[in-house]
Amino acid sequence: ELRYEDARRVLESHQQKAKRELAAREDAPPEALYYLACDDDPEVRGLVAANRSAPIQANELLQDDTSAEVRGELARKIARLMPDIPAVERSAIQDRLIGLLEKLAEDELPRVRAIVAEEIASCPTVPRAIARRLARDAEMAVCGPILEYSPLLSDEDLIEIIATSGAPGAAAAIARRACVSTSVSDAVVT
């Protein structure tokens, strides 16, 4: 296990290679990961964003990072944590994670939104509002996985999306769902 004093020495050394290694360590002290979330090097920040041990405060700093790669790594990590969060009993930390996921699902870059969509597509514990928002995205890379796999979309949601979606291929993604009701099937055909 990494001691706090050892992590502090790495931070004080200002050696990028050592900081990258520290940012990737699951046993790094939370304070060190928080400090590294503000590093000038986007690679260091990306490693913190991908680190499951990073404290929620570091994740919140990184949600608005100037680097799309950093936000993408954060989106991937947060979305992968979602299946582990029970739908009923949510703690304050879990609520903050959901807030991060909501923000990343609204990212200006389709690539970041697509990462969120791919990671949560079949997850039943994601808030339904996030799945519905991604399902209505104009980019197929974003809405496609949700339309095809999300268990959170109702028949009414799917029929409305077929009627109003501007994303080419939305109806085809819905048609590829494992189970499609007659009313949804009729909407796809017409």
Where are these regions (language model features)?
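Alpha-helical scaffold segments
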Residues: 1-190
